Amino acid sequence: MVHVSSSHGAKDGSEEAYDYRGNPPDKSKTGGWLGAGLILGSELSERICVMGISMNLVTYLVGDLHISSAKSATIVTNFMGTLNLLGLLGGFLADAKLGRYKMVAISASVTALGVLLLTVATTISSMRPPICDDFRRLHHQCIEANGHQLALLYVALYTIALGGGGIKSNVSGFGSDQFDTSDPKEEKQMIFFFNRFYFSISVGSLFAVIALVYVQDNVGRGWGYGISAATMVVAAIVLLCGTKRYRFKKPKGSPFTTIWRVGFLAWKKRKESYPAHPSLLNGYDNTTVPHTEMLKCLDKAAISKNESSPSSKDFEEKDPWIVSTVTQVEEVKLVMKLVPIWATNILFWTIYSQMTTFTVEQATFMDRKLGSFTVPAGSYSAFLILTILLFTSLNERVFVPLTRRLTKKPQGITSLQRIGVGLVFSMAAMAVAAVIENARREAAVNNDKKISAFWLVPQYFLVGAGEAFAYVGQLEFFIREAPERMKSMSTGLFLSTISMGFFVSSLLVSLVDRVTDKSWLRSNLNKARLNYFYWLLVVLGALNFLIFIVFAMKHQYKADVITVVVTDDDSVEKEVTKKESSEFELKDIP
């Protein structure tokens, strides 16, 4: 998994940067690894908090609050969906007004507050319903947590989502601001920073699902969440203490404003007549993006009403809320061109979300003994993270060099082909999950036997392998194909696919629960048919894959693509191709 700045364009040199006093930065005292290293702590802590909560929350909701499996899954996926969606808000606020430093600092403080509230919510006994004994649980007589008891939990979760979204969308961009890309030495350091950035995420995630989940299950939720809160508080303090060491950049405005403005003006002028020739559109002669006939309705945003009055026309052109330029209109068209691929990426994250909900609950109905040690249900997700790390390494050392020789392309296979491979892995994961769940249920119902929870490893492995391809492919696709002046929204588009994936999971669970009269997704999985739900995801995944292929084969890649490859010794190789393959070629997928 490779992480890229959420908010920077094609080139950001140190000449645009300033220190905390507003003066040109001294490279020997600001930025570089000195500043970036302090910033990494914020992302490390965010991962510890979010992964420690999301990967084990469903067991608390079902086991302690006596909430149904379907409702518990919906709570978790809505939380994760909101967190990623609020990443768009965090990116917008940073780009439009606050800047990345202020946004990360505020978000870290908000996240710390949210985890403190969660610690309180899970520690106070009055925030939980009465303990349910085995007899009541067997006969579905457990008292479910009421609205009053859930209120503080919801406030805590969505406070964390608000803060986590702000960190997620800005911390990598703020880290990259510490390097001057016009300096070859610092540009190389920035690429190395992204490697270390991902390493921090991996370390934080593994610590959360192994150590914190164990503490939550065996010592107490309060202790587990308390450690997360303390970690976030320390990270916020360290971030603030390093203020004098950072390089800052002024907000340049959000590209979402441009998209909204073009859409608004096109609608406002919808009754206007098209000019006799596109050259009469505002800014046609100075456009940096060639005019196209695609989505011609948007061209109306660039129609000037005062062609006969040069002074009035000049006034209009200075106010972007009166008339847009051809460049702005064409940039919005390029973004709209990405929507079909964006939409067909959503279901991958819907499948991924099952690893944080029903797969964790499956583990609670299986034999988790490892000798005398009982592995916490949420800790099995460590296999997901380890698989992602494994395949990321294999991609760099084996897969990319091999496919380069086979396809004669600098990056091995195209970004859309990477996404396609990830989608196939996700379908395979759900098919395997369905088979394993059927075997688990039959053993429990017919033989009163629990099969080993390590049978869940294959589905974690397949989803992890899929993420290694799909994550990189999606992020690479949006970064490459977004307009040059709208690169800052690349991560925003990517985060929105993750967000929508979790929300679609919530919607799907609700629909299935209603259509099947709650027979597929019961709290007692031995009386449920979770395997049917997994097979449904396989079918939906197959249909989505076919639609993806249709759109991918029609997609035309942008010209003049720069490929950046980080080798094992952290050296940087750049390769430029005049034109990517213009379509998604099935024959190139290994």
Curated annotation (Swiss-Prot):
It comes from Arabidopsis thaliana. Expressed in leaves, flowers and siliques. Detected in leaves. The lineage of its organism: Eukaryota, Viridiplantae, Streptophyta, Embryophyta, Tracheophyta. GO terms for molecular function: symporter activity. SUPFAM superfamilies: MFS general substrate transporter (SSF103473). Keywords: Membrane, Nitrate assimilation, Symport, Transmembrane, Transmembrane helix, Transport. One of its GO terms (cellular component) is membrane. This is Protein NRT1/ PTR FAMILY 6.4. It is found in: Membrane. Low-affinity nitrate transporter. Belongs to the major facilitator superfamily. Proton-dependent oligopeptide transporter (POT/PTR) (TC 2.A.17) family.
